[in-house]
């Protein structure tokens, strides 16, 4: 009798133990641009080697132990903000393998621009390679894929879905604001000034297009850009699109307002004469999903506030 009870107890214990083992030793594999990455548990020490990946981690509520070009992120991207105490591991084009190894990461996130170093990174920690920006890609869709995949890896699936739902809600809200105000008729040209004669104009194949389309706005610039989604043109290239509203994305070059005010060509542009020049705060055009939400809100607020005849 005792022997039988002990055997039953032992068998039950073994079954309980075995049922717990998959949770402790479960290994999942994800495919990426240079192969696959296998993880036995959600990573806790993650390093991001580009700003789109940094942004995605922060949106998921994960603070990376290290990022590339930390100070540059604070200047050009800013939001979502980097918490204090994150290590800098060098530049985005040439990160320090030594600095990365010292942080003992259990996951490194990078893109195909770092392909020559991928094998070296893999020796340090499992490495996930995904490129939001490359020839033929659709940036918002790739950024969404990265967010969802990282959410899966890090056991943050619900956070990833919440982020995407929030973005869609924001886009719908801003679209209704513009529609109710009757501000969706004229096309919009999104530009960054490089100097007083040249701009970076954002094309239909870029990240910003997702915001324009969702807001019900036409892109005034009909031409495809490079795989980053822009073209560099002279101001004269805007002239053939007289119906457009020009939205200038900060920052601008010093003294630009005064220079343009004295430029016969600039003051001749129809959008200038109609006082349909708008200027918004910086939005990082080469990020992940978050810049789409930020651009949609800033752009809507600016169009509702009204334009002027010059940049600030």
Q: Where in the sequence are the language-model features?
A:
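Extracytoplasmic substrate-binding proteins
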Residues: 120-194, 221-222, 285, 289-312
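Structured C-terminal subdomain patch of bacterial secreted/periplasmic proteins
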Residues: 145, 241-312
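Short helix-initiation/N-cap motifs at beta->coil->alpha
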Residues: 32-34, 89-97, 225-235
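His/Asp/Glu-enriched short active-site or ligand-binding loop at hydrolase and phosphoryl-transfer sites
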Residues: 69, 205-229
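Sec/Tat signal peptide C-region and signal peptidase I cleavage site
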Residues: 21-27
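Bacterial N-terminal signal peptides
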Residues: 8-21
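Proline-aspartate-enriched helix->loop->beta-strand connector
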Residues: 97, 101-110, 126, 235-238, ...
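A short, structured surface patch at a secondary-structure boundary
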Residues: 45, 51-99
């Amino acid at each position: 009798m005792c022997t039988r009870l002990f055997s039953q107890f032992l068998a039950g214990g073994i079954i309980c133990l075995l049922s717990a083992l998959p949770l402790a030793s479960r290994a999942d594999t994800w495919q990426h641009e240079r192969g696959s990455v296998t993880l036995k548990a959600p990573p806790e020490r993650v390093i991001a080697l580009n700003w789109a990946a940094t942004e995605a981690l922060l949106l998921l509520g994960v603070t990376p132990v290290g990022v590339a070009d930390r100070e540059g992120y604070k200047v050009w991207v800013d939001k979502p903000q980097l918490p204090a105490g994150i290590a800098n591991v060098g530049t985005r084009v040439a990160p320090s393998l030594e600095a990365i190894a010292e942080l003992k990461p259990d996951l490194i996130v990078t893109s195909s621009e770092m392909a020559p170093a991928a094998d070296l990174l893999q020796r340090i920690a499992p490495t996930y390679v995904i490129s939001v920006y490359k020839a033929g890609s659709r940036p918002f869709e790739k950024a969404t894929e990265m967010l969802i995949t990282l959410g899966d890896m890090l056991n943050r699936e619900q956070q990833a879905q919440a982020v995407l739902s929030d973005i869609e809600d924001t886009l719908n809200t801003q679209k209704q604001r513009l529609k109710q105000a009757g501000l969706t008729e004229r096309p919009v040209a999104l530009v960054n000034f490089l100097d007083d004669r040249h701009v970076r104009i954002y094309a239909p194949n870029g990240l910003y297009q997702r915001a324009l389309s969702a807001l019900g706005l036409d892109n005034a610039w009909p031409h495809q850009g490079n795989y980053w989604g822009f073209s560099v043109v002279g101001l004269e290239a805007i002239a053939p699109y007289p119906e457009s509203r020009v939205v200038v994305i900060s920052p601008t070059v010093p003294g630009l307002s005064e220079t343009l005010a004295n430029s016969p060509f600039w003051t001749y542009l129809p959008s200038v004469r109609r006082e349909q020049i708008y200027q918004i705060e910086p939005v990082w055009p080469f990020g992940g999903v978050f810049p789409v939400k930020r651009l949609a809100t800033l752009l809507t607020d600016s169009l509702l506030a009204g334009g002027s005849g010059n940049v600030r």
